[in-house]
């Protein structure tokens, strides 16, 4: 639809608004992680639009999609609004009459686009979800990610790193955020394209929440060897494989270059 409009309106400018989404799983909600997840989704979507030649900018919006839309309308004064949702049977936005409410409140024409991501196949670029904590900076994991990025015929590769927190308090979240920043910096030094967020203390919940937020080509889970890994004792790899609709890879790292716990 946007491609057709761009042919008609050469000066078409797009402002993309991504509302923050509350994860479905877990008893602990990290506000910064929710915003980080929305920011990564925004950057992915803008990259696709830019590759297609669109003049596009964006912002992370309120967790209420109606409020996020109205905030952007008030600031940007658009000529037209496009709202994309899942099919009616799967869309919470449609159950809350989002399209009709925005049209009535704004007085601006609203186009409704239905996107059935289950029918769209793999993501438009190669995206790996990486879940790790103590082994996130290990040589084994880094080399595996480099191999994926440089595989023969591989497209530009994005790695989304999730570092589960080690507890439910603010100090645990802050420590995980600091650890994540260090991991991302190390991977960028190796010329990898990365983004990341802190996850739920339960690694399975952290992984499932990330799969809710992102369409990925594969999941890469890094752990310590079986004799030292609580994640493996909890059967994390097989549990994720039962639910994920993409391949799940397991990287075992040595205990020599580790931080925190996995």
Describe the predicted segments one by one.
Residues 13-15, 57, 80-82, 111, ...:
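A structural signal for isolated positions on well-ordered beta-strands in alpha/beta enzyme cores
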Residues 44-54, 182-192:
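Short helix-loop-beta junction
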Residues 52-80, 191-218, 258, 262:
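Structural beta-alpha unit
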Residues 84-101, 223-239:
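Glycine-rich, Arg-bearing micro-motifs that act as flexible, cationic patches
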Residues 107-121, 245-262:
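Short, flexible loop segments at boundaries between secondary-structure elements
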